[in-house]
Amino acid sequence: MQKLQISVYIYLFMLIVAGPVDLNEKSEQKENVEKEGLCNACLWRENTTSSRLEAIKIQILSKLRLETAPNISKDAIRQLLPKAPPLLELIDQFDVQGDASSDGSLEDDDYHARTETVITMPTESDLLTQVEGKPKCCFFKFSSKIQYNKLVKAQLWIYLRPVKTPTTVFAQILRLIKPMKDGTRYTGIRSLKLDMNPGTGIWQSIDVKTVLQNWLKQPESNLGIEIKALDENGRDLAVTFPEPGEDGLTPFLEVKVTDTPKRSRRDFGLDCDEHSTESRCCRYPLTVDFEAFGWDWIIAPKRYKANYCSGECEFVFLQKYPHTHLVHQANPRGSAGPCCTPTKMSPINMLYFNGEGQIIYGKIPAMVVDRCGCS
């Protein structure tokens, strides 16, 4: 009993020496720690945003198989960009497309862009073939995007200059061939009879899928084509070599190739905004502005929402694979902690100039973060 009393006295003496406990001070310390944690989280997200933007620039160039961004000036773009229906329709698609709502479906995308449409502008022929002493129009080079995909559609687009009176126009598309014994240097592809009314000029499309298929099978037979569109007075209305004021009216090929559908699976995660205090793994908004990059070679979109993942991962929170938690429980020292990463990515459609001056409309996979999780 005496020993117990001595112990109590010693305990009371220690409390007196230690002094009173200030509960408000502890509360302030806790609040300061929480504020410091929030500031660190904001700084972390800011650094993550910057890193994500740089990674996106590298990804886009890599997925488009470009070593560097094409060096195309705004003036050159104005001259090269066709003012034609198919291209205007593609650009209009970007104007009306909103951010698609995520339904939890996760595509198994390939790494590189899967091309849907290629708009090919004419180039100078390496063979320097001439017809009647004049440079021919037009010669088209085809990239691997066309050569190694299944061809769905190939349209040649030509622009006919306006007429002052109602006129019947006879259009001919000729394929250049090696000179024959009788001197023949071309064979017909298509002939058209068009009725034009006074006013503005018109775009006319011609199906050249069969010709393109033959060229792809036998590249040496591709010597180019000749375009003629004569009115009743013998005046050629086809714009083959644009004159001043005819920028964007050069003939071009619109080629469509197949795109293989992919499987999908389900996934879910948290969504946050830039003001969120959520510490767990979460998806945050991030807008990529190509004009801010100085990337004028991207025609559309000029910007898009890419998003990024940030936050802490506990072993019981949003793990991508169910066995991750079990592995850690079995061997906590031998397994690294889970990381906050994208678990669902979706593609973006892009209209752009490649390094050869061709206009490409393609789908670039895994460019938008739709879901985040721990794995």
Curated annotation (Swiss-Prot):
Family matches, as PANTHER family: GROWTH_DIFFERENTIATION FACTOR 8, TGF-BETA FAMILY
Signal peptide interval: 1-18
Keywords carried by this UniProt record: Cleavage on pair of basic residues, Cytokine, Disulfide bond, Glycoprotein, Growth factor, Heparin-binding, Secreted, Signal
Protein name as catalogued: Growth/differentiation factor 8
One Pfam family in the UniProt entry: TGF_beta
Origin: domain of life: Eukaryota
Main location: secreted
UniProt-annotated glycosylation sites, renumbered to this chain: 47, 71
Residues excised as propeptide: 19-266
Gene Ontology terms for molecular function: cytokine activity; growth factor activity; heparin binding; identical protein binding
Family: Belongs to the TGF-beta family.
Species lineage: Eukaryota, Metazoa, Chordata, Craniata, Vertebrata
PTM info: Synthesized as large precursor molecule that undergoes proteolytic cleavage to generate an N-terminal propeptide and a disulfide linked C-terminal dimer, which is the biologically active molecule. The circulating form consists of a latent complex of the C-terminal dimer and other proteins, including its propeptide, which maintain the C-terminal dimer in a latent, inactive state. Ligand activation requires additional cleavage of the prodomain by a tolloid-like metalloproteinase.
A cellular component term, taken from the record's GO annotations: extracellular space
Disulphide bonds in the chain: 272-282, 281-340, 309-372, 313-374
GO process terms (BP): myoblast migration involved in skeletal muscle regeneration; positive regulation of lamellipodium assembly; positive regulation of macrophage chemotaxis
Subunit structure: Homodimer; disulfide-linked. Interacts with WFIKKN2, leading to inhibit its activity. Interacts with FSTL3.
Subcellular location: Secreted
